[in-house]
Amino acid sequence: MTSLPSSIFQGGLGDQPQSGLVPKVVEQTTRGERAYDIFSRLLKERIVFIGTPINDQIANLTVAQLLYLESEGSSQPINIYINSPGGVIYSGLGVYDTMQYVEAPISTTCVGLAASMGSVLLAGGEDGQRACLPNSRVMMHQPMGGTEGQASDIEIQAKEMAWLKKRLYQILSFHTGKDIDQIEEDADRNHWLSAEEAQEYGLVDQVMNEGNLDALKSIHANGEASDADSDEE
C-alpha cells in the first residue's frame, strides 16, 4: 500500500502499473476514414471502462464521460465495465454519486476484478443490470488510511474514517439488501467472492454465461448497425 497524504483514505490492493499506450481504431465510413482512440470508440457505444486503481484523475475522467453521455439525452443504458483493485474513497464516491445522478440506467459488469471501492461501484449499478463475467473476483473490506500530527488532528481523522466506513456500509446495504451489521462483519477483513458468490450476496444480479454473452454481443451489434445507418445519412 502506498503512503498517502494524512487526510486521504483509500481502500484497494495497492498500486498497479499503468501504460501510456492507447490503441487506435480506424473505421471506414462513407465519408472516409475515422480514427479513434479505443476509449473514445467505446464511449461512442455508451461504454465506460474503469481498468485502473481509482484516483482523482480516473474519477474525473469517468465522471466527465458519464456527464457527456447524460447530456446527449438518450435513455439508452450506459455500460460501465470494471477491472479495478479499488482506490481513493473520495474519488470513488464521486463516481458513485454521478452514477446515481444520471437519468440513463447504468449497467455495471466486472471483468476480472472489482475490489474495495470497485465492488461499491459494481453494486451501484441499476437493479437487474449488474453482472460478473464467470471468472471474475469481487472483494469487500473496510477502508484503510493513516494520519499523523497532534492528538486532536488524529482524533479528527479517526472520526472521518469512521464516517466513511459507515457510509460505505450503508451504500452496500442499500444495494445488496444485507443488514449493515452483516456487511460490517463480512468486510472486517478482505472478503473474497467468486462471481456466483457475488450474485448470491446481492452485489450483482447475474453471472454472464455463454447464452447471455451472446445476447450482449447482439445488443452491441445492433448499436453498430444504427451508427452505420447514421453515417450514411
Swiss-Prot record:
Residues at the catalytic site: S116 (nucleophile), H141
Listed EC numbers: 3.4.21.92
Chief site of localization: cytoplasm
Any GO BP: protein quality control for misfolded or incompletely synthesized proteins
Classification via PROSITE patterns: CLP_PROTEASE_HIS, CLP_PROTEASE_SER
MF GO annotations: ATP-dependent peptidase activity; ATPase binding; serine-type endopeptidase activity
Reactions mediated catalytically: Hydrolysis of proteins to small peptides in the presence of ATP and magnesium. alpha-casein is the usual test substrate. In the absence of ATP, only oligopeptides shorter than five residues are hydrolyzed (such as succinyl-Leu-Tyr-|-NHMec, and Leu-Tyr-Leu-|-Tyr-Trp, in which cleavage of the -Tyr-|-Leu- and -Tyr-|-Trp bonds also occurs)
Subcellular location: Cytoplasm
Pfam families per UniProt: CLP_protease
Keywords for the protein's UniProt record, in alphabetical order: Cytoplasm, Hydrolase, Protease, Serine protease
A GO cellular component entry from the record: endopeptidase Clp complex
Family, similarity comment: Belongs to the peptidase S14 family.
Entry function: Cleaves peptides in various proteins in a process that requires ATP hydrolysis. Has a chymotrypsin-like activity. Plays a major role in the degradation of misfolded proteins.
PANTHER family: ATP-DEPENDENT CLP PROTEASE PROTEOLYTIC SUBUNIT (PTHR10381:SF70)
Quaternary context: Fourteen ClpP subunits assemble into 2 heptameric rings which stack back to back to give a disk-like structure with a central cavity, resembling the structure of eukaryotic proteasomes.
UniProt-recorded name of the protein: ATP-dependent Clp protease proteolytic subunit 1
Organism encoding this protein: Salinibacter ruber (strain DSM 13855 / M31)
Name of the gene encoding the protein in the UniProt record: clpP1
